[in-house]
Amino acid sequence: MDKHLIVVLSHRDFKKKSLLMENLKSTEKYDAEVWYQDEGFYNRNKDKWHESVHVNYQEGSTQGDNREHSMKNWANYKYIVTIDDDFKSLKKVFNEDGKITLEKYSGKMVERRKNSFNNLIEFIEGSIMAMEESDIRLIAPQKPYFPYDPNKGIVVQSAYGTALGVWNSSTAITAFKYALSNNYTRLHGDDNILNEFMYVNGITTAEDKRYAVSFGWGKDDVSSIRPQNTFDKLSLYDSVLLEHLFPGRNKYFLSKNGNTIHSHKRKNTDEELIPIIFDKKVPVFPGLEKYYNALMEDLKDDRRSFHI
């Protein structure tokens, strides 16, 4: 077995871990390990974290003192796949036979989506296929709070059922290849993920021209990208979308905390905003055309928001 795989489960479900390990061993393909990322356990037992769990999932990204240590740990593994089976925006149900059923997004996404690969092993296989074809080390279906060595690979993030579709689709692989070929890593525009990306890559200003670009929904989906909100606050996905629609005509500013993009430098505010420059054209991926077209219809009467 020449493929060293690590799978990270989000909670300490021993039955699930046992089932997963049994399935992985049956493939006879991977020298695999299963770790837990139990944020709740960490919060309650901060001092005992290292005694109970092999990977310090949260500390490694949010506390600088532990960043280097965690980075060294991750560098030992060829493939990293995280399975966040219990987070707010998406509900996964693991059946006894290892099948995964994906329920609808809570809140904005009303369409019911189901996973196109039926079981856990297929998910992992699909993830590894994407990583192999795109030279990616880690796939995380939610927020990748992983420090990493950019010389060893790129962190790629998404959630199931986003506009790009499933992990093992050619569309997703196309997106990965595009992101990598342009020195982009695919991250959400919410929380502090962009800030984290800039930190681990040593990016201090927008002059570096290496930016986190989201091809997923980010914090806002298409239903929220409307003229009436004046585009005051944008997710990274929104910004990429607008740049594709109106190349070079948009002005974007990143908030100092790294988690909000503004469409213009607002007046009457003391907030420090960093200008963002897009120097790459962002393609429309298969499956996104209908969203672009719908957005274009919405924008016909309000192009002033785009500084045209």
Where in the sequence are the language-model features?
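Conserved catalytic core of nucleotide-sugar-dependent glycosyltransferases
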Residues: L90-G189
